[in-house]
Amino acid sequence: MIQAGDFRKGTTFEMDGDVWQIIDFQHVKPGKGAAFVRTKIRSVMTGSNRDMTFNPNEKYEEARIETREMQYLYNDGTLYYFMDPDSYEQLPIDKASVEEAILYIKENDMATIKFFKGKAFQVSPPNFVELEITQTEPGIKGNTATGATKPATVETGATVNVPLFVNEGDKIKIDTRTGEYLSRV
């Protein structure tokens, strides 16, 4: 059991026959009245979001989430296929569960997949990835005195702001949590 006062970002719990994940939370202690926890939660099963307030003393059953590393194989337009590297079992995952993580995952890359009762509900790329730039404007020398950036499209289709000295064909390192350029590889 977990108390609402112990909610943190990423916490998963069961409520009303569904599994919910905390997206954002705020502990509120007003001058008058009782304290409460204001949250934004997402249904693990349906993907719908809700804003809820909880009494910090309310208790909920903590959801048991399984995490596995799997290899991304391909997509057929509607489903994304991942493979367990130990058993070679292939797992199709719908587009809603993959969300924006696929912008940082190439074919044959590893990804972290979260499961609840055998159903995949979230795909996460590694924290840092190296991708090749497929399209960007050429940087013009003398354009600026400070570190200016320009948009660049990488091989997976994601758009990243990069420094002016980065060109097409360069490999760059990206922080997938923020989507920011880190360095040239």
From Swiss-Prot:
SMART domains: EFP (SM01185), Elong-fact-P_C (SM00841)
Gene Ontology biological-process annotations: peptide biosynthetic process
InterPro entries xrefs: Elong-fact-P_C, NA-bd_OB-fold, Rib_uL2_dom2, Transl_elong_fac_P/YeiP, Transl_elong_KOW-like, Transl_elong_P/YeiP_cen, Transl_elong_P/YeiP_CS, Transl_elongation_fac_P
Keywords: Cytoplasm, Elongation factor, Protein biosynthesis
Single GO term (MF): translation elongation factor activity
Family: Belongs to the elongation factor P family.
Annotated protein name in UniProt: Elongation factor P
